[in-house]
Every structure is written in C-alpha cells, then in structure tokens.
Amino acid sequence: MSAAIDWGRMAAPQADGYDTEVTLRLATTSSSPLRPDPYRRRPVDGAPTLFGGRVAVRNRPSGGLTPPRYAPASPTHPNLAAAEKLLEAWPDIAVQFPQLIDTIQPWTDTTMTPEFWLSVPGSSSHSLEDEFGIIMATVDSPIGLAQALVHEMAHHKLRALGVSLLQASRLVTNNPEDLFVSPIIVNRRRPMTAVLHAQYSFIHVTALDVALYDAPGASEDQKRHAIYLLARNVPRMEAGFEEIEAHVETDAEGAVFVAAFMSWSRAVLARGREIMDANGYGIPAL
C-alpha cells in the first residue's frame, strides 16, 4: 500500500481529508511491535460525547495519568465542549480529529487552582501506541486541552504512518542508538524518531495557536493566550527544525514526507514569529 501513498500530502492536515483516509487505512490494516492488532473503532456505548456524537468521553478504567497529582475528571466537564469549539479555528483539524480519535479520557491536575489556569493555559496529556484513537488529557484549561487534543492526535497519526517513539518501520532510517537534541525533553538526548515525534506533535500545537490568534472574531483573551503560547512554542520548534534538518536520515518515502513537513513547519513558524513581533513578544530564536 505504501507505494500508492502521496507522502507529500501526509504531513499537514489536508482540506480534502486525504491524509486522514490514508492514516485510517494504515491503522486498520497494519500493526506494529507495540500495536499488535489493527485498529478497530470503539463504540460510544452510551457515554457522553463530543463532535456530534462521534467521540466518547469516558474515564479510564485503570492506569493513565499518575496519581495523586492527576485524578479522573467529569466526562461532562464544560471545558471539553469549550476545547471542541476552539478546534473550529482550524477547520481541517476540526474535521480530522473525530475521524482519527474515538475516545477522550478526562483528567484534572489536583495541584493547580482554577485561577492558575486563567493566566497560564496548559494541559498534561498522554497516549499509547497500542491504543490508537484514545487520548488522555487534563481538562482544567480549555485552550490547553485543545492543544493536548491535537498534540496527541498527531502522535497517533505519526505512529500509524510507521514511526514509533524509539524506532521506525518506514520514513526515518537513523540508527536508534544515535541520539539528538529534542526540542521538548531537553535534559537528555533522544533517538531521531523521538525528536520527530516531539517536533511533529508540537508543530500541530503551534499551528493551532496561530489559528486561534487569526480566527475571525477571536476574543482578546483568546488572542492573549495564543500569543503567550506562541512565545513558548515557536523558539523551541525553531530549534527542533534545525536539529531535524541537520540530522534526519530517511528512506525515499521519508524524504518526501519530511520535505513536506519542513515546508509546512516553515510557514507555521514564520506566521508565529509575525504574531509575536507584532505584539511585542518577539524573542531571539534559540
């Protein structure tokens, strides 16, 4: 099947849904060492839902984000619907998300107050390779949750395309024992597959930040939060861009995919810089 894939259209979300269709086809017809069975969409089974009844919201039966800091949140927490609404700022993602994701597992950070999240938006989140379609995320901040949803969806997509966190079956050919600087986990070097995962997921986050700022009718609070998040994300994504550009090794398909990803990234980061500069948040690139 991979020979028929237009890898130049698989990096950024496509308006016609091409990348969504291919990702689902790969997820439902293939496996990986960490996902031994092909994906089968989980039924809603009466759970509360988002995205027009397509995405179930239910608490995780066991495991998940680590207690006591994190505790299960209500599946009807109002920030879930608020985050869904925020994704509408990026129409291609708003359409793609409920096709690739079937379950959101909500959590809360017990160490932070509601007032904290009003000034410092964010979310803790996680997803597992053997659970394609499931996202765990804290719901305390609507914009932070929206970021977490696209962040973890991007991880799921990249895994389905053949790039796991520590190894790859296609696209990336770097030796897993060779380590590089991650734009996110900065205290230790990581395999190139992990660096690409960090960059790919957070470019999605950064693109959402740009979309939230540029959205017609965006409130001043939404713009303020988007600027704050861009100031946090753009410099480290610029550093990650340089690390990947200098060191990634690919097969023929990966060369096309990475070129398309870097082209999209360049446009996202350029717009992010413009927004920061226009609002007095311009800071030196790392």
PLM features: residue spans?
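N-terminal low-structure segments adjacent to metalloprotease catalytic domains
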Residues: M1-N59, Y281-A285
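Auxiliary, metal-adjacent structural segments of Zn-dependent hydrolase domains
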Residues: R60-E129, P142
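Short, charged/polar micro-motifs that form catalytic or ligand-binding hotspots
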Residues: R69-A73, I135-A148, V186-A198
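Extended, well-ordered protein cores
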Residues: S123-S125, V150, A160
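Post-HEXXH active-site segment of zinc metalloproteases
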Residues: V139-A148, H156-R188
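Active-site/pore-lining binding-face segments in mid-to-C-terminal subdomains
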Residues: L179-A239
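Pan-zinc metallopeptidase signature
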Residues: R224-L286
